[in-house]
Amino acid sequence: MIQSQTYLNIVDNSGARKIMCIRVVGASYQRYAHIGNVIIAVIKEAVPNTKMEESEIVRAVIIRTSKEFQRDDGMRIRSDDNAAIIIDQKGNPKGTRVFGPVLQELRQYNFTKIISLAPEVL
């Protein structure tokens, strides 16, 4: 579960390394974000000499959380870290590579481009 002020790792090659969530996109009362939700975040750490700069406001989709996620068949999946991928306004990833596994639940949120870039789909 991701809420405001939560730090996340970026697992693509867009140029950012860490972001901090500042808003969960959706209903005005929505406090927590889960896998597949879009957040608005600020870049806290970036790779030097890239197009992403620190303190830049970006949109990101959550692909892994430390809080376990339960599927409809009862299987629970948990990750070691909170991870996200930076996207543009249309929902396309800004990076061209994705590091680490992603969950197949992203398919129902129409993030098929992220799934095709991922090396492993759980």
From Swiss-Prot:
Q: What pairs make up the disulfide bonds?
A: none
Q: What are the annotated GO cellular component locations?
A: chloroplast; cytosolic large ribosomal subunit
Q: Where in the cell is it found?
A: Plastid, Chloroplast
| SMART domains for this protein | Ribosomal_L14
Q: Does the keyword Ribonucleoprotein apply?
A: yes
Annotated GO biological processes are: translation
Swiss-Prot/TrEMBL keywords: Chloroplast, Plastid, Ribonucleoprotein, Ribosomal protein, RNA-binding, rRNA-binding
The superkingdom of the source organism is Eukaryota
Record GO terms (molecular function): large ribosomal subunit rRNA binding; structural constituent of ribosome
InterPro entries given in the database record: Ribosomal_uL14, Ribosomal_uL14_bac-type, Ribosomal_uL14_sf
- CDD domains assigned: Ribosomal_uL14
Q: What does this protein do?
A: Binds to 23S rRNA.
Assembly and partners are described as: Part of the 50S ribosomal subunit.
Name the PANTHER family on file: 50S/60S RIBOSOMAL PROTEIN L14/L23, LARGE RIBOSOMAL SUBUNIT PROTEIN UL14M
Protein name, per record:
Large ribosomal subunit protein uL14c
